[in-house]
Amino acid sequence: MSFYPILRGPAKQESPPPPPAPKKRRKTARACLHCQKAHLTCDEGRPCARCIKKNMGDQCVDGKRKQAKYLVGLPPTPPGQATQQKQQQQQQQQQAVQHGMGPPDTDFGSSAANLEYSILSNILGRGDTSSPPDFFPAQSPHMPSPMSIPGLHMEEEGSQTAGTPQGSPTDIYTSITKPYAYTTGFHALIAYLKSRFEKKELLDVVKSMAFYRPSFIATTQTLQYEDLVFMEKCFQRTLLEFEKYISLSGTPTVLWRRTGQIAAVGKEFCVLTMRSQADLLSQFIIECMDNKSVVQYFDVFSELAFEDSRGTITTTFGLTKPSGEVVNTACSLTIKRDVFDIPMMIVGNFLPIL
């Protein structure tokens, strides 16, 4: 029996361990001026390691931050004007405290926006009171009731009347010079709700408002005055096209702003609700609904405004006639947005349920 030798290759040599990875430089919050120009990573030391290596330690200073694009070109606020704005904001807050409201917790950079937000916050925070606080007293010169506001649905000076767009786009672009006063409309809406609903229903409505109203305030804070004027031009231009659609459609149709103010209405809707077109153009859309439908409308709108990307829903609402009779209808709501993706118009199509 023969044995064959087992041939073995040369012993394997263990490979040397890989060199340790170089430590990455830790990014600092602000690079020095030289590293910023060279687009290199800087460290937190001053002078930094790169400037020391290049013998420029005495010139190592923090670089300048770039200004936000929406702030470029804005003139600096004079010190006197800033002080005056601060005093006006403090006066607004003092008046709010006298009317039963505490100072707003959130600063939106605007006293009017802070006051609006405090209205919602205080109504929600007083659910255990016997009645909601009176934010809009009858003698208040700043917040009149809806019925006492002359031309509530009129634009500010330089704009045009809601619901009566000009005959051509050129007229719209030349006649509108000021933005629409949405804050006034919102205050009037709150005053109307307070005069109509009891505490429980009012709290349900305001809870729905609290979901979308702060978003409206926050999204408009970054817009300039020219942007707000452009938004109104977009609204009136869209309204002009829908006027043609309403005149050709046989479906009861009504258009209103995000504050609920009716801007255009078809004759079929006037017949359905037994109201004249002139009366409807001076009302909120919720004035044509029964109490249950009003609460439901604000709940639906809070979902469509920013959460639902489709911006349309089909539901049922009860419309009221001046006699008090309720007409049950199937309704299709569609939200139209402007170029800033902010809801600007709601289109409602109503069909009676027989």
Swiss-Prot record:
Residues 159-169 have a biased composition (Polar residues). It comes from the Eukaryota. Residues 32-60 bind DNA. GO terms for biological process: cellular response to starvation; gluconeogenesis. Residues 1-29, 71-111, 128-169 are annotated as: Disordered. It is found in: Nucleus. One of its GO terms (molecular function) is RNA polymerase II transcription regulatory region sequence-specific DNA binding. Pfam families: PAS_13 (PF24990), Zn_clus (PF00172). Coiled coil: none annotated. PROSITE patterns: ZN2_CY6_FUNGAL_2 (PS50048). One of its GO terms (cellular component) is nucleus. Residues 81-98 have a biased composition (Low complexity). Keywords: Activator, DNA-binding, Gluconeogenesis, Metal-binding, Nucleus, Transcription, Transcription regulation, Zinc. Its main location: nucleus. Belongs to the ERT1/acuK family. PANTHER family: TRANSCRIPTION ACTIVATOR OF GLUCONEOGENESIS ERT1, ZN(II)2CYS6 TRANSCRIPTION FACTOR (EUROFUNG)-RELATED. Transcription factor which regulates nonfermentable carbon utilization. Activator of gluconeogenetic genes. This is Transcription activator of gluconeogenesis ERT1-1. It comes from Yarrowia lipolytica (strain CLIB 122 / E 150) (Yeast). The lineage of its organism: Eukaryota, Fungi, Dikarya, Ascomycota, Saccharomycotina.
